């Protein structure tokens, strides 16, 4: 398997729970490495741009409102099969359907406030990483 990178966002609900450390520890325990990270407060424009793929969906405005409601922690994760591994750690989008021990099962409040975001494909990962980080801000290790 190839080493991949994926974008991960710890959303405002999980940040408010002081869950950042535990979430990052779970990534690292699974073999993923954090190679870039920062805390940001997204503007409405940034959130609309980042989630533009969902612009026509009925939940778009609520998503933008939620993602701008507090700070988020964004990080680039690197490792073997990182995209799939991160999505397994996150669990199902709906926390009621997420397996025990997944991030969404343990930290999400609802399908809307679902604790974490992760890229769903190599192409998406590349675009999402470039949205938040310049190449020289990513430090492979």
Swiss-Prot record:
Which cofactors, by name? Mg(2+)
Record keywords: Zinc included? no
Q: Name one Pfam family in it.
A: NDK
Give the EC number.
2.7.4.6
**Catalytic center at which residues?**
117 (pros-phosphohistidine intermediate)
What start and end residues bound the annotated signal peptide?
none
Q: Which domain of life does the protein's organism represent?
A: Bacteria
Give the record's GO biological process terms: CTP biosynthetic process; GTP biosynthetic process; UTP biosynthetic process
Supply the SMART domains for this chain.
NDK
State the CDD domains in the record. Answer: NDPk_I (cd04413)
Q: What does this protein do?
A: Major role in the synthesis of nucleoside triphosphates other than ATP. The ATP gamma phosphate is transferred to the NDP beta phosphate via a ping-pong mechanism, using a phosphorylated active-site intermediate.
The family line of this record is: Belongs to the NDK family.
Query: What is the designated name of this protein?
Result: Nucleoside diphosphate kinase
Q: From which source organism is this entry?
A: Halorhodospira halophila (strain DSM 244 / SL1) (Ectothiorhodospira halophila (strain DSM 244 / SL1))
Gene that specifies this protein: ndk
């Amino acid at each position: 398997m190839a080493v991949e990178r994926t974008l991960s966002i710890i959303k405002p609900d999980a940040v408010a729970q002081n869950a950042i450390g535990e979430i990052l520890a779970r990534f690292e325990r699974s073999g993923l490495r954090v190679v870039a990270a920062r805390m940001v407060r997204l503007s409405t424009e940034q959130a609309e741009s980042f989630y533009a793929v969902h612009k026509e969906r009925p939940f778009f405005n609520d998503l933008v409102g939620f993602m701008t409601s507090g700070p988020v922690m964004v990080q680039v994760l690197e490792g073997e099969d990182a995209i799939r591994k991160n999505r397994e750690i996150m669990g199902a989008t709906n926390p009621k359907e997420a397996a025990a021990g997944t991030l969404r099962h343990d930290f999400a409040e609802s399908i809307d406030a679902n604790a974490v975001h992760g890229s769903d494909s190599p192409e998406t990962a590349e675009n999402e990483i470039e949205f938040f980080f310049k190449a020289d801000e990513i430090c492979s290790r």
